């Protein structure tokens, strides 16, 4: 499993994104993506330019808006969310549904022109297996929590090869590492890349030290740049190792 994009190239796109993000229609996206994940999602989509995006998890709709900015030739977004009443932004390019990704027939979609975006706090494995079964190659996993945090099973937890935590409803439960899950990802993933944070503060979003226990790509900017990008600095804690996956 290898990286697809270089740190230097990712950083070159920050200034352009800052201008895009400054014009976002939803300024307070609490509970959803903010700049630490909006930027890498935008970057990946600009590079891949899919015709179709499956968006699993819509929330207020800011991600949907972002997809339109990154992919001007986008033909359709299939936006999935069981709670559409939270949506503030509605796209003319989106087809909205409540039916889960796993329960939808995707056979008519052009697999080579589709990217699947998971932002639904769900077990990643059945979803990755569904992508493999259907033939989808390009995936973004937004909720890619490390082994000691988070409310769902993620690629980062699996690839850590460590016992992992699921923190749900106020209860933290430790689960044993599953070697068969690691082997499945190792066998079926061509590219796996955790996208870098824009800023990396001393503490994680959970308030503990952001050290070697949280392996992380080098940040794109240092604290000395915080006055140049105040919004990025303000939202620096909203990072959970968003990743790009290309299946074999």
Set out the residue ranges of the language-model regions.
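A short alpha-helical cap/connector motif
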Residues: 1-116, 120-248
